[in-house]
Amino acid sequence: MGSGEVDGICVNVGVQNGATTGMQAAPFGGSVRCVCKTGGGHSLVAGGDGGAGGNAGMLALGAAGGAGGIGGDGGTLTAGGIGGAGGAGGNAGMFFGSGGAGGAGGFGRTTGGIGGTGGNAGLLNGSGGAGGAGGAAITGPGGTGGAGGIPGLIGNGGNGGDGGASVTGTGGNGGAGGNGVQIGNGGNGGSGGTGAAAGKAGLGGLGGQLIGLDGSNAPVSTSVHTLQQAALNVVNEPFQTLTGRPLIGNGANGTPGTGAAGGAGGWLFGNGGNGGHGATNTPATATGGAGGAGGVLFGSGGNGGTRGGATGGVGVRGAGGGGGG
């Protein structure tokens, strides 16, 4: 067992598949959060899984769960290899705080690693953590994106992670976005990765029952909810046209394979869109797009897009929103 420092307080950490995983912070730790996590080790056969992010203290006020570790690369120098799975994001404290982001899946020559699931928010306030992106592959399928986490009564559902790209195989499917509860948006469904055949986009989360916009690619809901969504779209249209971001809603995901940046979340609240992954069949320097910024009142920044080419490294992650983000 090793030791990791969390906001000035040391906690024990464990080891999982060669990856360090943070233990839960002290139950009465105030604003302490557990952020200790380590990526999985690389291998010629199968990369190690990333460690899970630590949970915040049970009664911590506004502390976020730790981010999951990135899965290790598999088969970087050989014909075979499976990318390691990304670690799950840690959960927030019991009542307040946002869930941690899931770790990205590792690159695998034959199969990309699965993205980690986003952590859940506190019961009253906080946004769900974003799901990690699936890992890239060359000859086989890209990894599936992780599901977004569950928010509190006030907060946005986490975006689903984008599916991993593949050079000659099928792109990975995107992860599902988390549903809003009362006030807040549903998370965007993760975009499908590019490949010989593109992966499917994940289902978007539904907006909160009182107010909130559905995430991208959300399923059909009740007639009352559909009318609510139509009214919000009318309100959002002039803001989107004049400023490039909605009043209430998430930013759009960047187009997969272009390295385009994700759009910014709403002026009031919303998640930033995920950045699109870089182009495939290109050098490893084909970078992914930056994630969009979160909403002004509350909202999480979008995940950065993974690189194209043959590496599956991670792009820049968007800035989180202020306030409850």
Predicted features and spans:
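Collagen triple-helix signature
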Residues: 1-218, 226, 248-325
